[in-house]
């Protein structure tokens, strides 16, 4: 695949960088949560890290025929303090993607008729809405010195859709059957 428009290509690189960093940040914060006796919050971080990996991979694959050196600028929370603050950093990052980043990227791709970029931005935007809610629920529990009470976390391997619903039959974003989902 190749992208014809420089602005959409820049947005794909930026989104790739942001999702890549979120992936690593959530893995680190997940380990810290587990080490602080919050195994379910740790598992939630790791599951959502997998979703962010899928988003980064999707963005990358739209540009994979455009191989050249490029700076990737992506602003994000860096570091780690405590569980509550880490969850707030995750919430803030997800809300930035939902309210600012992906709506602009999606509309630009749509305007520039970049169908593959439009698809990957749509997938990420819809999944991030769920991530923000799950992180908020986790933070609410952590503020009460409790781990979040959740069963398995299911991630769609195509779009990164995230759900706690074990009875879901297929992804509501991309249509993939649940038997393909990764469970955490």
Swiss-Prot record:
Write down the superkingdom of origin. Answer: Bacteria
Sorted alphabetically, the keyword list is:
Electron transport, Iron, Metal-binding, NAD, Oxidoreductase, Peroxidase, Transport
Leader peptide range in chain numbering: none
Residues bound to Fe(3+) 2 are 52, 94, 128, 131
Known catalysed reaction(s)? H2O2 + NADH + H(+) = NAD(+) + 2 H2O
Q: How is the cofactor bound?
A: Binds 3 Fe(3+) ions per subunit.
Q: Which residues form the Ferritin-like diiron domain?
A: 2-146
Induction annotation: Various environmental stress conditions, e.g. oxidative stress (exposure to H(2)O(2)) and other stress factors such as salt, increased pH, high concentration of solvents or cold shock, do not lead to increased transcript levels of this gene. However, PubMed:15336429 shows that rbr2 is slightly up-regulated after exposure to air, but PubMed:19648241 shows it does not respond to the presence of O(2). Is not repressed by PerR.
Described purpose of this protein according to its UniProt entry:
Functions as the terminal component of an NADH peroxidase (NADH:H(2)O(2) oxidoreductase) when using NADH:rubredoxin oxidoreductase (NROR) as the electron transport intermediary from NADH to Rbr2.
Q: Write the protein's name.
A: Rubrerythrin-2
Species of the source: Clostridium acetobutylicum (strain ATCC 824 / DSM 792 / JCM 1419 / IAM 19013 / LMG 5710 / NBRC 13948 / NRRL B-527 / VKM B-1787 / 2291 / W)
Q: Please state the gene responsible for encoding this protein.
A: rbr2
